[in-house]
Amino acid sequence: MVCLKTLSVFLAAFAAADARAVFKTQGHKNSEMIPDNYIVVMKDGVSQDDFKAHVSSVASIHSTNKAKRGTNTEGMKREFDIMNWRGYHGHFDRDTLEEILNDSKVDYVEQDQVVRISGLVTQRGAPSWGLGRVSHRQAGSRDYVFDDSAGRGVTIYGVDTGIDINHQDFRGRARWGTNTADRDNADRHGHGTHTASTFAGTAYGIAKNANIVAVKVLGSDGSGSTSGIIAGINYCVQDAQQRGILGKAAMNLSLGGGFSQANNDAVTRAQNAGIFVAVAAGNDNRDARNYSPASAPAVCTVASSTINDSKSSFSNWGPVVDIYAPGSDIIAARPGGGSTTMSGTSMASPHVAGMGAYMIGLGADPRSLCDRLKQLATPAIRNPGSSTTNRLLYNGSGQ
């Protein structure tokens, strides 16, 4: 005979264990974790009121623990709400973290980590070849053939090191959006200006008439955090929603870090909301499944090709790669005027973001656009990598 008291204790313990949130072990062996910094994601269906109540409770718990133990943790830093996907980032002591994990409204918690650009600077002044390549089936042409609508009426968010919005290549089409990295609203690195010029520059870009928004999530050294990137994505979705341009927007993320479920969830929500999302596969010549946001199934993950239609030696590969695009020795704008040449999957991704905006301008649906680009693409890449597509970006020009 089962003792009812014992059974009730067992069931209570089981229920408590079942309610405890998951602490996700993220990244790969080279990931740089940020000590005592955590991203907390709420369960689907948690209302805004319940979320606010939870945040208030956590702030109170942290304040009590900090006073009791004299820790130097900062507590709550920023909140996220991407189409009802709710969460926050904070700097918490172990006791506060335990309280968070035991809250039944929390889905999972992961430690924040460093994220970096996916570009490699090379020499200045080299000739660019990517525009000609993506508008011709055969390699070798320097002519870019495209519909003159060129992304008109579409907005591209450059989630990066910032953008020199006054550069002549943008002709007044660029504006500053937000900065989650630091207090300096400028591109002190050059990476973000280069990628923006590739996706929408007048001289160097794919979608020459698209609007451009600078979303700074990485600092002058090219690094940032997963939480900062999620905050940038949060801004993009809310801005597009407020401006009524969901379905007429694209986003480029030429960056990456170790695997992060929260990062993947954030870009997935953006994609599902009606923003076409292109991301860099990464530059370690490894399987992109171990990187985020490259491993998110919903986004368009881009590997890098050379002028000879080979996989760039540095490019990540694998089954999560959706498409190849030019990424070696790409010339585009640099802050302050003029141009420079960079290489990386960072340079490949904005070709696809720009092509996404170009196609949206012609009536394509952002939600199914990556599949459309894969259908149009040319099966041209030699030695693409294990279990990796050989398809190279093409704009359907007929050339």
UniProtKB/Swiss-Prot annotation:
Pfam families per the UniProt record, alphabetical: Inhibitor_I9, Peptidase_S8
GO cellular component: extracellular region
Proregion positions: 20-118
Subcellular location as annotated: Secreted
InterPro entries the UniProt entry points to: PCSK9_ProteinaseK-like, Peptidase_S8/S53_dom, Peptidase_S8/S53_dom_sf, Peptidase_S8_Ser-AS, Peptidase_S8_subtilisin-like, Peptidase_S8_subtilisin-rel, S8pro/Inhibitor_I9, S8pro/Inhibitor_I9_sf
Active-site residues annotated for this sequence: 160, 191, 346
PROSITE patterns: SUBTILASE, SUBTILASE_SER
Residues bearing attached sugar chains per UniProt: 102, 252, 308, 395
Major site of localization recorded for this protein: secreted
One Gene Ontology term from the biological process aspect of the record: proteolysis
Keyword set includes Lyase: no
Signal peptide: 1-19
Domain Peptidase S8 per the UniProt entry, residue ranges: 128-399
UniProt entry keywords in alphabetical sequence: Glycoprotein, Hydrolase, Protease, Secreted, Serine protease, Signal, Virulence, Zymogen
Domain Inhibitor I9: 38-117
SUPFAM superfamilies linked to this entry: Protease propeptides/inhibitors, Subtilisin-like
Record GO terms (molecular function): serine-type endopeptidase activity
Sequence similarity: Belongs to the peptidase S8 family.
Function: Secreted subtilisin-like serine protease with keratinolytic activity that contributes to pathogenicity.
Record PANTHER family: CEREVISIN-RELATED, PEPTIDASE S8
The protein's name: Subtilisin-like protease 4
Source species: Trichophyton tonsurans (Scalp ringworm fungus)
